[in-house]
Amino acid sequence: MFKREEIIEMANKDFEKAWIETKDLIKAKKINESYPRIKPVFGKTHPVNDTIENLRQAYLRMGFEEYINPVIVDERDIYKQFGPEAMAVLDRCFYLAGLPRPDVGLSDEKISQIEKLGIKVSEHKESLQKILHGYKKGTLDGDDLVLEISNALEISSEMGLKILEDVFPEFKDLTAVSSKLTLRSHMTSGWFLTVSDLMNKKPLPFKLFSIDRCFRREQKEDKSHLMTYHSASCAIAGEGVDINDGKAIAEGLLSQFGFTNFKFIPDEKKSKYYTPETQTEVYAYHPKLKEWLEVATFGVYSPVALSKYGIDVPVMNLGLGVERLAMISGNFADVREMVYPQFYEHKLNDRNVASMVKLDKVPVMDEIYDLTKELIESCVKNKDLKSPCELAIEKTFSFGKTKKNVKINIFEKEEGKNLLGPSILNEIYVYDGNVIGIPESFDGVKEEFKDFLEKGKSEGVATGIRYIDALCFKITSKLEEAFVSNTTEFKVKVPIVRSLSDINLKIDDIALKQIMSKNKVIDVRGPVFLNVEVKIE
């Protein structure tokens, strides 16, 4: 906390001095907690749900009302809608199945088996029979069966489960039996039901839309087909409705997603629930992609199918696949990867990778941590001293009840060199998935590497960590370890850097895995010629 009164008094006496000196009150974050190792965290929406919401708003802007159509459809409705084509259509439908409820009696043999488990049945026989009978009749849910058996016999639920497994094997041998109910394979099967019920409840004309999941029994899933998908469908019912309404709706809807220019091409499929010569494919031009894309289908429902539902006015239906539109909008190549990204490779961008490059060892004690900054500044200032030369830094620390006098000596004994090597100010960058050390100046860099390094510096993400920074933290971290272990001296020698660990750096395994799998590189090679002796008294 700031001592506000002292600061105000200091500022009143000498504002400039107070302004400069109080900067030390703003403590910088530790290096592993500084940018770009910290990054903003945002929630992330799913592209399919984004597209659904955009489609909802687009339909609402066009005056449509939103409805939810039935997901479970009786196969009789498929026959009513498709006529003789129904059998072929039902082949792509999922049928709902359920386990039958076995007629389980409480015979003398089963009573004997229960009693062998140490449970007295005689007092509870009638209660147990009622439970088994209730399950058979459907008045007791299956997920309550174990609990009710346990309560009836006054035993634990674990023992109740054992009875169900050991005494009533009939439950384990059950096989699902298919019903006549199907999961909606396309939105049309629901529209007939909805429009039929609204005919005597809403004035004509009316415009409805629904965006919901459909299920299709594809032979296999591939980059453009899933067994479950979302349909964004609408229906317009009223006198005078025809395919021209479909064209206008297609243009109005899709123009809100960046499409321009539309082609309406007769669909060769000719589904029997559409009036002949009305089933139409919509192709739209996308200026960004510079392509014509098939994006929707519409048609006018057949009077034959409509009449079976008591609908006596034309109904135009338009539908499009949400996933298809999301793929176009997001430039995805594979619907599986777009819908289920968690099952596919996650690509880290350069910013992500940069946040995963950190110092391996950092001192914990504030005094020693602060020494690092002084050490870095001295090294940078004196890096070009001509050898033989040395740089000495002395400090006294309080460690527990003792005083520690520390002398750090950085030296170069060999003649004709500098105190520190030419790569000492190299900085770690992430560029195009690579982790590279880039020099402060490109003087003397070979032409074959120069272009890549220049691009890395201008287009890559800087980590803000230079070799000298990381190495100085290595020195002070070892100093802290020496305090703890009561060591009196140690040396640090790093002549040539070949890997991140040589300069006290590490990278997250997730980033490392991507670098290796994508044939990217970690190249931090360079001469630093660091020689350090530390003595502690």
Curated annotation (Swiss-Prot):
EC nos: 6.1.1.27
Annotated substrate binding sites: 186-188, 231-233, 273-274, 317
Keywords: Aminoacyl-tRNA synthetase, ATP-binding, Ligase, Nucleotide-binding, Protein biosynthesis
Protein name: O-phosphoserine--tRNA(Cys) ligase
Job description of the protein: Catalyzes the attachment of O-phosphoserine (Sep) to tRNA(Cys).
Species this protein is from: Methanococcus maripaludis (strain DSM 14266 / JCM 13030 / NBRC 101832 / S2 / LL)
Superkingdom classification of source: Archaea
Top class in the EC scheme: ligase
Any matching Pfam family: SepRS_C
